Design a protein with these regions (language model features):
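Hydrophobic alpha-helical scaffolding
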Residues: 29, 57-65, 69, 96-101, ...
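Extracellular S/T/G-rich loop segment that most often corresponds to the catalytic His/Ser-adjacent loop
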Residues: 1-80
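Extracellular/periplasmic catalytic domains that process cell-envelope and extracellular macromolecules
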Residues: 30-33, 40-41, 103-104, 207-208, ...
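Flexible glycine/proline-enriched surface loops and loop-helix/loop-strand junctions
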Residues: 51-57, 90-95, 149-150
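An often Trp-containing, charged/polar helix-loop segment at the C-terminal end
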Residues: 77-146
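C-terminal edge strands of extracellular/lumenal beta-sandwich accessory domains
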Residues: 103, 108, 113, 199-203, ...
Length: 315
């Protein structure tokens, strides 16, 4: 089997500010140790034509961004087609598509959850990922803080991994599942919780020993416009007010357990608007996902998007 890897370009690395350049670098990264990189995409050593018609090398995020936005456009086109098909189906058939498919939180959860981290060996245990991403010092995602620390959802340099349009399509096309009944191995949902409440998603088949499970939870920080002139849009001189971030947590649990202290793994960052779990299953069996609205900083009800990808012995 051909091993495929890609190391991030040095010029585009993100890292915690340290040393003599810390004062300058502090201005370039998120505050409070929040992860500024969510996703990476190919943008180095590209051959592009300049205005003179000559092929020249190009590097940078400006060339990586179109791959991400293009993937979103493809997913939205597919989602709209599913919504149009839904309107022609008999009333007794309930397709897994609603207008939630257009929400930006859903797109973010789908892209992050389907990103490539470590190449699959061909047995599907690594969820069919197509390449291994390498950060500085040639370390992969399994060697990152994000893999081993429950309070760190994303890697500083790799984020959740490299965007993969085909895997994003597979993640998104699986459809929406509310959690009211057992959910399939791959899926997504948009929902809202009141403070203190939680929502469980019971996976309908036992997870395979040695397989990985990928879970991503996304929601928004509440930022409001100080609308001085009352025209409900930004005007020169007006400012935006940060009302803070509600605190949601994400847990992977055995199906029969109910206390979060019994969770197999969790993502419980206090500063990020994303929680992410990429965890290897040591004990095969039935599992469930739990989303918990732990603390309200602004509004007492919070919308969120969840995406999951897992593997059973029968896949």
């Amino acid at each position: 089997m051909l091993f495929r890897s890609r190391k991030l370009d040095f010029s585009n690395l993100s890292e915690a500010p340290v040393g003599t350049a810390k004062k300058i670098e502090d201005l370039e990264v998120n505050a409070n140790n929040r992860r500024s990189i969510g996703l990476v995409a190919p943008g180095g050593n590209l051959r592009l034509y300049n205005l003179a018609g000559k092929a020249v090398p190009a590097n940078g995020t400006s060339f990586a961004a179109p791959l991400v936005t293009g993937t979103v456009a493809l997913l939205q086109e597919f989602g709209d087609r599913q919504l149009r098909t839904k309107s022609t189906l008999p009333a007794n058939i309930k397709p897994r598509w609603t207008l939630d498919a257009r929400r930006h939180e859903v797109m973010k959860a789908v892209l992050l959850n389907s990103a490539d981290k470590v190449q699959d060996n061909g047995d599907g245990l690594r969820l069919g990922m197509t390449r291994t991403m390498l950060a500085k010092n040639n370390r992969d995602w399994l060697e990152s803080e994000a893999y081993s620390d429950r309070q760190i959802p994303l890697d500083y340099q790799l984020g959740a991994g490299q965007v993969n349009a085909d895997r994003a399509y597979r993640q998104f096309s699986s459809g929406q599942y509310s959690g009211a009944t057992p959910v399939p191995m791959i899926g997504w949902n948009y929902h809202a919780l009141d403070v203190g409440a939680y929502q469980d998603y019971l996976i309908d088949r036992p997870l395979a020993e040695g397989s990985f499970v990928s879970l991503t939870l996304t929601w928004d920080r509440l930022v409001e416009l100080t609308d001085i002139d009352g025209n409900q849009e930004y005007s020169l001189g007006e400012e935006f007010r940060d009302r803070g971030l509600n605190h949601l947590d994400l847990y992977l649990m055995h199906a029969e357990d109910d206390r979060i202290s019994q969770s197999v793994w969790s993502s419980i960052s206090k500063v990020d608007s994303v929680q992410h779990i990429f965890h290897q299953i040591r004990d095969p069996g039935k599992y469930k996902i739990r989303v918990h609205f732990r603390q309200a900083v602004n509004l007492p009800r919070q919308g969120y998007a969840l995406a999951w990808w897992s593997r059973s012995n029968n896949q």
